[in-house]
């Protein structure tokens, strides 16, 4: 029983350490999602999608992917800001779900 616990504990520690490391070989997930969000076919022809970084008054929604409309001192008003977690593993899962929703949206609109 102790061996199983040690193996499980070692795997958990390894996974946490690996997720905390920044890998410079791959582009940043935020940059990838942002470039996808800025795509013409994703925003739609009528420009109805309100995305991360856009000025807003209430909610920010595009094809079911919702972010929060918050005050920004640097932008001089309210802008859409993405939700996130300080734990990179949770962010990776959230970004994966977001990418799937966006891909579905892009497929429907284009």
Swiss-Prot record:
- Main localization (coarse): secreted
- Annotated signal peptide: 1-19
Q: Which cystines does this chain contain?
A: 49-63, 56-69, 60-105, 62-80
Show the GO MF annotations: ion channel regulator activity; toxin activity
Does Ligase count among this protein's keywords? no
- KW 4Fe-4S (keyword) present: no
Give the subcellular location.
Secreted
Q: In which tissues is it expressed?
A: Expressed by the venom gland.
Query: Single GO cellular component annotation?
Result: extracellular region
Residues making up the propeptide: 20-43
Assigned keywords, A-Z: Disulfide bond, Ion channel impairing toxin, Knottin, Secreted, Signal, Toxin
Role description: Probable ion channel inhibitor.
Family membership? Belongs to the neurotoxin 03 (Tx2) family. 02 subfamily.
What does the domain comment read? The presence of a 'disulfide through disulfide knot' structurally defines this protein as a knottin.
Q: What is this protein called?
A: U32-theraphotoxin-Cg1a
């Amino acid at each position: 029983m102790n061996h199983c616990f040690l193996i499980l504990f070692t795997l958990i520690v390894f996974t946490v350490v690996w997720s905390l490391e920044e890998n410079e070989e791959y582009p940043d997930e935020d940059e990838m999602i942002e470039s996808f969000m800025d795509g013409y076919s994703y925003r739609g022809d009528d420009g109805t999608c309100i995305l991360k970084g856009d000025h807003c008054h209430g909610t920010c929604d595009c094809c079911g992917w919702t972010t929060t409309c918050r005050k920004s001192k640097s932008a001089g008003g309210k802008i859409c800001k993405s939700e996130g977690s300080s734990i990179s593993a949770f962010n990776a899962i959230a970004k994966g779900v977001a990418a799937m929703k966006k891909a579905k949206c892009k497929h429907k609109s284009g």
